[in-house]
């Protein structure tokens, strides 16, 4: 099986790459430079007409939407333990609900904070402030849950931990959001980043940026 991940360092494709690393499989990567607008280039639109990352090509077939990609990887590589299992069909869907929440609800708030200009052609300060307020509410909920639990689902890591980490850490990058208000999230972040699979993700991303001659962000 030939797998290629189309990604950009620090984007939500970082979560997808972490899942691939946890699965311990061989895969190729192709960086799509979001800063230069490569995602909207004719060449990339031939790969993914949605013009976004991540995109995962498996034996010539393309899969998009992070929550769907992660769900498929969990099916293909169950031994990796990307998501918790349950014999109860309703409980078994909870991780998929959480991933959809990350993608459809939380990610747009991240975008409000980091890229408010995408929401309007006018003044952006109100949009960013609204995103910061919303993320504060969400982070309070994250912190309450993680204060009494090592990982999102208890004592065992899942890819949802990386997705939640990506949400709050990306919001805070560049001091745009006051993450220090939530010490439980700082502790959770340290646990996520300490995992060998995540360290391999960081190395791959650094290598991709260096190969492209791009700087490594301070909050990487």
Residue ranges and their predicted role:
Residues 46, 194, 203:
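Phosphate-coordinating loops and pocket residues in cytosolic domains that bind phosphorylated ligands
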Residues 87, 200-208:
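Short, flexible loop/turn segments with low-complexity composition
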Residues 33, 159, 205:
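Short, solvent-exposed turn/loop segments enriched in Gly/Ser/Thr/Pro and often Arg
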Residues 1-129, 219:
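GST-like domain detector, emphasizing the conserved glutathione-binding G-site
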């Amino acid at each position: 099986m030939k797998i290629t991940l189309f990604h950009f360092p620090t984007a939500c494709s970082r979560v997808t790459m972490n899942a691939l690393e946890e699965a311990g499989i061989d895969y190729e990567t192709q960086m799509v430079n979001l800063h230069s607008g490569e995602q909207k280039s004719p060449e990339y639109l031939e790969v993914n007409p949605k013009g976004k990352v991540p995109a995962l090509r498996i034996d010539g077939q393309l899969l998009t939407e992070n929550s769907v990609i992660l769900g498929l990887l969990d099916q293909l590589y169950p031994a990796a333990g990307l998501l918790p299992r349950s014999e109860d069909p309703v409980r078994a869907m909870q991780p998929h609900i959480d991933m959809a929440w990350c993608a459809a609800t939380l990610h747009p708030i991240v975008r409000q904070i980091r890229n408010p200009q995408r929401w309007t052609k006018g003044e952006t300060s109100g949009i960013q402030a609204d995103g910061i307020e919303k993320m504060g509410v969400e982070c309070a909920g994250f912190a309450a849950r993680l204060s009494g639990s090592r990982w999102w689902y208890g004592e065992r890591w899942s890819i949802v931990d990386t997705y939640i980490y990506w949400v709050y850490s990306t919001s805070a990058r560049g001091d745009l959001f006051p993450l220090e208000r939530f010490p439980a999230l700082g502790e959770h972040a340290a646990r996520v980043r300490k995992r060998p699979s995540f360290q391999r993700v960081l190395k791959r991303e650094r290598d991709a940026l260096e190969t492209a001659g791009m700087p490594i962000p301070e909050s990487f």
